[in-house]
């Protein structure tokens, strides 16, 4: 699993890059439709609990651990408005698998979309110019990367909801997700600031690791 950032400061775009070791998107951090059945009250309770823990962290190692938990919980929180990225990804993978014409690949669920894209190299000189329609209502583009080979961009309702251009899987948020994200962090930062402001003098003097790294955290968040 890997998580990194790119394009910090880009307005309206989610810059989280999250991939599993096998090249698949890491769905623990990438929102997709129907991930959770928690009630709103349960979400609020968990968000506030993480905020309280974050407000009292003692070092950056703890901060990194908590920030990952925040990103995971946020992915769940957005699931009721998120597009079905997981289904779109599987449809894209199946579409490209058919392009390989390699029967040995059939049923190889452990292979990622990029694995199948790699198998298309040399099979079609205009492959990057094609736009594949997906059953879920999205489209798949496969741009040629400067490093060689193909990348993948899955678009849905005008938004690039999932992409990999050589550095891992990232995504942009839909307008509904952006609104839900703001709602999530309104709860989070209100509780975080409340704990900081109402804490003991010792707590208020504690290094504020989240505020020190807040631009980075908010880009990741």
Regions found by a protein language model. Give the residues of each.
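Type III/flagellar secretion export determinants
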Residues: 1-221
